[in-house]
């Protein structure tokens, strides 16, 4: 697994200045425990979506993924929108439970700006994806999860496949792995 050495895991946001800021931040913390729910503040807000300010005003606690600020969970209000690093159950637990219950009983929406998106359209789209993905492709109007494997059968990507039409697919995956997945698709064309 050479993921840690793959420069494709960094996007355009990772300028030399960003590298210096994050390297310094990590070096300063070299003997400090990192908590599972902890996000580090330096080098943030490289990219935001059009909904960023609205989310903040609605009590969003933000994280960053591949340079993009994304919602982790929502507090009741802007003043409660903070996390406290812990190895125990974090303060997000009750808020997230409430979000989950609301989606189960009502309806919910998700912003997928931090997901990678790959579109495949054409008469051979299904045949190609059936070759590079290990899962069964969905029928039109359906979605499925499908792993993308290496030639040796190791997991290369965990993807969601939406079949928009008989020969039209939208594939979602990790935003941080977008370039890595794109290379794999192109290698197998």
Residue ranges and their predicted role:
Residues 2-189:
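Glycine/proline-enriched, intrinsically flexible loops and inter-domain linkers
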